[in-house]
Regions:
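Primarily the HKD phosphodiesterase
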Residues: 110-111
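Glycine-rich loop(s) and the adjacent beta-strand/alpha-helix scaffold that form part
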Residues: 136-137
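Bacterial N-terminal signal peptides that target proteins for export
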Residues: 1-9
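C-terminal beta-signal and terminal closure region of outer-membrane beta-barrel proteins
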Residues: 11-12, 140
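C-terminal motif of bacterial Sec signal peptides marking the signal peptidase cleavage site
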Residues: 18-21
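Extracellular beta-rich repeat passengers
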Residues: 30-84, 89-97, 101-102, 115-125, ...
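Bacterial signal peptide processing site
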Residues: 23-26
Length: 508
């Protein structure tokens, strides 16, 4: 995806200190137990220690309100408050400021306002505590009626922390003012657990969107597990630096990449599923993994060196036997938002480039045009693979058109010459050769027939994926050792209760 910065307060008027009484005695979990409301300004933006309102306008602050934010395009929350179980509308870019803490109860539904590109943004030192349960997940979704929801109906969820990245202090992408980065790798930005994020990723310009879930320099003190991002208008998940570990992630029918890692992200991610929609792909070419050290491919440290294990990538060919990788076929289908987002083609299960040292183990990818791209256009990703600082071990591919290529948007499995820009089809690509090295213990097949049950991603009882895992590499010490390749054991139930694979028709 294209990286960019978007500055400014969008015409927000600065407010002076004002004080008013709360409109209701029920403080909806506000920890001070007081009815006083404190207004201030933060960077020229109105700020308040209460976050709920009955309607747009500062005078409508009310802890029994159903609107999150005062209705301005940007609003800063400075207090500590719990949002009780219920249904709410999120308006504008709502920042959880340094020292503030927002807790959301299980079973809460938060609908993002389309007009204000609503987004919830935890800034450095702020905490978002969204701890749902399997029976009562917390849902961030579109305000549109069922049948009319589209990718990009609202902004998304952004967490920014104080952990290390390889560009010191960075502006988060997507529009908001927020910066991330620091030196505290154990920083705690809160909890996201049993959470769904649906129809997010509002496009400000072509290829300039907030992701479904954006994580900027998030530290290991943060808890992230059991999160499903569905129909994001950009990447489903993107990490910019940071050390946070994540488990039990679902990327469902996103627009661009499923799991995008940048700027020195070094956490562990285990048990993750991506399932594509054959009609949705981005103009930049959609991938399962996209991974950069940084935009220039420099040797800035820390390198992007995250460890992924037990990932299942279900590509467009696996979900649609009639799939064609062209613009006539990839038309957005029934969820095309007509909001300026440009469609493109599908590319690879794994696109690793720009000096990334990404690691992946015990994973399976099925039905992509390309299995693996090791791209040396900027930096020396192939050198990292040769040196063993980029590890791809015990990975199974099936049903790929080509096993590997060496350059973005090249669909030929031949050795790429970076000086002449030509492909030598008499030789295998570097990516192909690396994938097949005996020491890597990878395998590729023409078909995945018999591997999965009727879901298309959970292994059948006699699947060859069961019993095929290996956790002998020391780099996997931070992961849970299991005996299967991919995100699931046979009959696994970690998706049960909290996920929804038809959010278009959910009654909210």
């Amino acid at each position: 995806m294209n990286k960019f910065k978007f500055y400014g307060c969008l015409g927000i008027l600065a407010a002076s200190f004002t004080f008013c009484a709360c409109g209701n005695d029920d403080d909806n979990g506000k920890e001070t137990g007081k009815n006083d409301v404190t207004w201030s300004t933060d960077g020229g933006i109105k700020a308040c220690d209460h976050i709920l309102f009955t309607a747009a306008g500062d005078a409508n602050v009310n802890d029994n309100g159903r609107q999150i934010g005062n209705g301005d395009q940007e609003f800063v929350f400075t207090g500590k408050q719990t949002i009780k179980k219920g249904t709410y509308i999120l308006k504008g870019w709502v920042y959880i400021a340094d020292g503030a803490e927002l807790t959301i109860e299980p079973g809460t539904i938060i609908k993002g306002d389309k007009q204000t590109k609503a987004s919830l943004i935890a800034e450095r030192g702020g905490k978002l505590i969204a701890q749902g349960t399997a029976q009562e997940p917390i849902v961030f979704t579109s305000e549109e009626a069922k049948g009319n929801r589209r990718p990009g109906d609202w902004g998304g969820v952004i967490l920014c922390g104080k952990a290390v990245n390889n560009n010191t202090e960075m502006q988060i992408e997507g529009g908001p003012r927020t910066k991330h980065g620091g030196s505290d790798n154990s920083d705690n930005s809160g909890v996201l657990s049993y959470v769904r994020i649906e129809f997010a990723g509002y496009p400000f310009q072509t290829d300039q969107e907030i992701n479904g879930l954006t994580l900027g320099s998030i530290g290991s003190g943060t808890k992230i597990d059991h999160v499903q991002v569905s129909y994001s208008n950009d990447d489903s998940y993107e990490w910019f630096g940071g050390t946070v570990d994540c488990k039990y992630l679902v990327a469902y029918r996103g627009w661009d990449d499923d799991f995008d890692t940048d700027n020195g992200f070094s956490g562990n991610v285990q048990f993750a599923l991506s399932v594509r929609d054959s009609k949705i792909a981005d103009t930049s070419q959609s991938n399962g993994f996209e991974s950069d050290n940084n935009a220039s491919g420099s040797t800035s440290s820390p390198f992007t060196s995250a460890v992924f294990s037990n990932v299942t990538f279900i590509g467009p060919k696996a979900v649609d036997a009639s799939f064609q990788n062209n613009s006539d076929y990839i038309n957005g289908g029934s969820v095309y938002p007509n909001n300026g987002s440009s469609l493109g083609r599908f590319q690879a299960a794994m696109h690793i480039r720009r000096n990334s040292h990404l690691n992946c183990f015990n994973s399976v990818a099925v039905g992509w045009p390309i299995g693996l791209i090791l791209d040396n256009e900027k930096g020396d990703t192939q050198g990292a693979a040769t040196a063993g600082t980029l590890k791809l071990n015990n990975i199974w591919f099936a049903g790929m058109d080509v096993l590997g290529t060496d350059f973005n948007k090249i669909y030929e499995d031949g050795l790429y010459d970076y000086e002449t820009g030509t492909v030598d089809n008499t030789k295998n690509s570097f990516a192909h050769t690396f994938f097949e090295l005996a020491a890597n213990n990878n395998r590729h097949f023409d078909s995945a027939d018999g591997w999965f049950d009727r879901t298309g991603y959970i292994p059948s009882a006699d699947s060859p994926l069961i019993g095929a895992a290996s956790f002998t590499e020391a780099i996997l010490n931070g992961c849970t050792a299991v005996d299967y390749i991919g995100a699931f054991a046979a009959g696994d139930t970690w998706l049960d209760g909290w996920t929804n694979f038809d959010p278009q028709n959910a009654d909210y």
